[in-house]
From Swiss-Prot:
A proteolytic cleavage by the prohead core protein protease gives rise to the mature major capsid protein during virus maturation. This is Major capsid protein. Belongs to the Tevenvirinae major capsid protein family. Major capsid protein that self-associates to form hexamers, building most of the capsid in association with pentons made of the capsid vertex protein and one dodecamer of the portal protein. The major capsid protein self-associates to form 160 hexamers, building most of the T=13 laevo capsid. Folding of major capsid protein requires the assistance of two chaperones, the host chaperone groL acting with the phage encoded gp23-specific chaperone, gp31. The capsid also contains two nonessential outer capsid proteins, Hoc and Soc, which decorate the capsid surface. It comes from Enterobacteria phage T4. GO terms for cellular component: T=13 icosahedral viral capsid; viral capsid. It comes from the Viruses. Homohexamer. Interacts with the portal protein. Interacts with the capsid vertex protein that forms pentamers. Interacts with hoc; one hoc molecule associates with each capsid hexamer. Interacts with soc; this interaction reinforces the capsid structure. A total of 960 subunits of the major capsid protein forms the 160 hexamers.
Length: 521
């Protein structure tokens, strides 16, 4: 099998991608959708169900823009133009028409990375740099981590001397250097400028972090990083009879993750009498109507799955560095004066929400090292709030929600907030919330991946007992996660192992998304 280049795929499928009268496909998506077309074509060239006479007849009365009657070959220009050459005897073109209309409407193209698969399984590889020569050793930590700073003593003084870690009740000595691991920013080295005793009540990580920050603010502990003296460096690794002084080493590992295709399938049965009466009274074709129902339902379910996975894996927002002291974690409450910063009227409180969104977006950049959050998924009420206030540095006026399109009967894309965030409406949200997420300029730069394999497979048969017709559709695709999505883990062995999201590797851990519930609107 010859593997086509991106340019070859775009050239082959250009008539279908840009067909007159068909929904427009953005240039950035055309290469991906061309690959999906290629996978679909490969499937119906080899699968016998596409050549079933009854299925061909069922498809013969609808999707005329994508039929090529009697054409067993494949001509993308004819598909786009709706040209036929006789009775429909092969339904591949008609199925392609359904794919052409449905696939671009998936929200996954806007908020996920889209990676079409060539086979039922796909692989994602990640290279990780590690402190130490053994990348799988217990306690080994990953280097170049976007969230945690470098171990600034690893190649310097830390290679020759091990510094004690600060803990509750530790009494410091002036001039001595100590080490501490901050939960949010990683390892630091601190020199004592005065003698202090660490609070005995700092018994957990959060309390110890707060106590050490307090001592740093008071000037009792000062962050330091330093190289080793030349006299020590030249003796390392057993030089001139010295012992117990090895050079520090680094290594790397390549992790493999597997993504497997899943399936969705639906069927519908109807009576011959229903089909006859529907045709006679309403001029409608039962096959055409049911095909549209099944294909649309599958698309809507995939859309919902993508949104659910994002919210499922999103970190709890308004926590850590985005939490305003004194307010509730994970919730932005318009009735809480701390959250709205003492706002005098609604417009000011709405602007406080904008600032919280900015904080979450910046936190995504800090944890992922890829970029600030650039899209928002939110409930209707939250989108109305965003549409009712200006985003400029101005008086906090509140007005009618004219900034966005909040009518989900037309589109779930509401608009662009402040020139920074693409806003999408979760029309089925059970309570008010917003999720800030990041998707980069290429399809690998995302928190989760939608990986279509075979976009649509039609099936048709009859019940062996009553001979009534039955039709169905299948779709196969995978959902994958970015191997670097769990930013809080620095030990390579504890990073994501499976390529598919689960409660163990995803629930509340994906740094590419942050979700905040909203109350009191």
């Amino acid at each position: 099998m010859t593997i086509k280049t991106k340019a070859e795929l775009l050239n082959k499928w250009k008539p279908l991608l840009e067909g007159e009268g068909l929904p427009e496909i953005a240039n950035s998506k055309q290469a991906i959708i061309a690959k999906i077309f290629e996978n679909q074509e490969k499937d119906f060239q080899t699968a016998p169900e596409y050549k079933d006479e009854k299925i061909a007849q069922a498809f013969g009365s609808f999707l005329t823009e994508a039929e090529i009657g009697g054409d067993h070959g494949y001509n993308a220009t004819n598909i786009a133009a709706g040209q036929t050459s006789g009775a429909v005897t092969q339904i591949g073109p008609a199925v392609m028409g359904m794919v052409r209309r449905a696939i671009p409407n998936l929200i996954a193209f806007d908020i996920c990375g889209v990676q079409p698969m060539n086979s039922p399984t796909g692989q994602v590889f990640a290279l990780r740099a590690v402190y130490g020569k053994d990348p799988v050793a217990a306690g080994a930590k990953e280097a170049f981590h976007p969230m945690y700073g470098p171990d600034a003593m690893f190649s310097g003084q830390g290679a020759a001397k091990k510094f004690p870690a600060l803990a509750a009740s530790t009494q410091t000595t002036v001039g001595d250097i100590y080490t501490h691991f901050f939960q949010e920013t990683g390892t630091v080295y601190l020199q004592a400028s005065v003698q202090v005793t660490i609070d005995a009540g700092a018994t957990d990580a959060a309390k110890l972090d707060a106590e050490i920050k307090k001592q740093m603010e008071a000037g009792a502990l000062v962050e330091i990083a330093e190289g080793m003296a030349t006299s020590i460096a030249e003796l390392q690794e057993g030089f001139n009879g010295s012992t117990d002084n090895p050079w520090n080493e680094m290594g790397f590992r390549i992790d493999k993750q597997v993504i497997e295709a899943k399936s969705r399938q639906l069927k519908a049965a109807y009576s011959i009498e229903l089909a006859q009466d529907l045709r006679a009274v309403h001029g409608m074709d039962a096959d055409a109507e049911l095909s549209g129902i099944l294909a649309t339902e599958i698309m809507l379910e995939i859309n919902r799955e993508v949104v659910d996975w994002i919210n499922y894996s999103a970190q709890v927002g308004k926590s850590g560095m985005t939490l305003t002291p004194g307010s509730k974690a994970g919730v932005f409450d318009f009735q809480d004066p701390i959250d709205i910063r003492g706002a005098r009227w609604a417009g000011e409180s709405f602007k406080a929400l904008l600032f919280q969104i900015d904080k979450e977006a910046v936190e995504i950049a800090r944890q992922t090292g890829r970029g600030e959050g650039n899209f928002i998924i939110a409930s209707r009420n939250v989108v109305n709030v965003l549409a009712s206030v200006d985003t400029g540095i101005s008086y906090a006026a509140q007005g009618l929600a004219t900034g966005f399109s909040t009518d989900t009967t037309k589109s779930v894309f509401a608009g662009v907030l402040g020139g920074k965030y693409r806003v999408y409406i979760d029309q089925y949200a059970k309570q008010d919330y917003f999720t800030v997420g990041y998707k980069g300029p290429n399809e690998m730069d995302a928190g989760i991946y939608y990986a279509p394999y075979v976009a649509l497979t039609p099936l048709r048969g009859s019940d062996p007992k009553n001979f009534q017709p039955v039709m169905g559709f299948k779709t196969r695709y995978g959902i994958g996660i970015n191997p670097f999505a769990e930013s809080a883990a620095q030990a390579p062995a504890s990073r994501i192992q499976s390529g598919m999201p689960s409660i163990l590797n995803s629930l509340g851990k994906n740094a590419y998304f942050r979700r905040v519930y909203v109350k009191g609107i």
